[in-house]
A protein has these predicted regions:
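Conserved acetyl-CoA-binding loop of GNAT-fold acetyltransferases
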Residues: 1, 147-156
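Acyl-donor-binding surface of acyltransferase catalytic domains
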Residues: 1-24
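A conserved beta-strand-loop-helix scaffold within acyl/acetyltransferase catalytic domains
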Residues: 47-101
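Conserved acetyl-CoA-binding loop-helix of GNAT-fold acetyltransferases
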Residues: 102, 108-125, 144-148
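Conserved GNAT acetyl-CoA-binding A-motif
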Residues: 123-135
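Hydrophobic adenine-recognition pocket in adenosine-nucleotide-binding enzymes
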Residues: 31, 100-102, 135
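A short beta-loop-alpha structural element at the N-terminal edge
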Residues: 27-39
Length: 181
């Protein structure tokens, strides 16, 4: 049985860091229904489970609380995505960052940060003052991105506090290796 995802909160949306640079051939835009097939491929690759266009349409629908899905598109197609979702009963006053993913071939280009930041701008423009998300212990590059954007871990149980301690130590170690390398 897998553990529940770890929780993070960005307590303030008014002071976002600048967007990271990206190559001019990469466009940040809102997703359209014609992207569903490519989004299914990307999400299958990023999360290791099977997606199809029908599942994308259902998961990223207004009926599921999703207000917008953003993508980074390259000449090869959709290479990164994140969605803006609202769950007001669970997280009043906060937007929920939903399904951040990038193609394996594009990792390291900070495209996840680009689309996540766009989702945060969406939330701020909609009058929200916070954002929340859930992530997995093993997604260290994603956690590093969220920390860079100002998210803070919010343990919900004593077990979460221990898990966060391990995750943050791992992030610190890998950051040190990158700086020295």
């Amino acid at each position: 049985m897998s553990e529940p995802q770890l929780f993070m909160r960005l307590p303030e949306l008014s002071d976002l860091p600048p967007a990271p640079p990206r190559e001019s051939s990469y466009a940040l835009r809102a997703a359209v229904p014609a992207d569903h097939g490519q989004l299914a491929e990307l999400l299958s690759e990023a999360f290791g489970d099977q997606w199809d266009a029908k599942r994308v349409a259902a998961e990223f629908s207004p009926g599921n609380g999703v207000e917008a899905t953003y993508v980074v598109a390259s000449p090869a197609g959709v290479v990164a995505t994140a969605s803006a979702r609202r769950l007001p009963d669970r997280y009043p006053g906060a937007g929920y960052v939903h399904y951040v993913g990038a193609r394996v071939s594009e990792r390291g280009r900070r495209l996840g940060e680009v689309v996540t930041r766009r989702v945060l701008v969406h939330f701020a423009a909609g009058g929200l003052d916070q954002a929340v998300l859930e992530t997995d212990d093993f997604r260290l590059p994603a956690v590093r991105t969220y920390l860079r954007l100002g998210f803070v871990p919010e343990p919900r149980t004593a077990g979460d506090a221990r898990r966060w301690s391990k995750v943050l130590r791992s992030v610190a170690r890998t950051s040190e290796v990158v700086r020295r390398g």
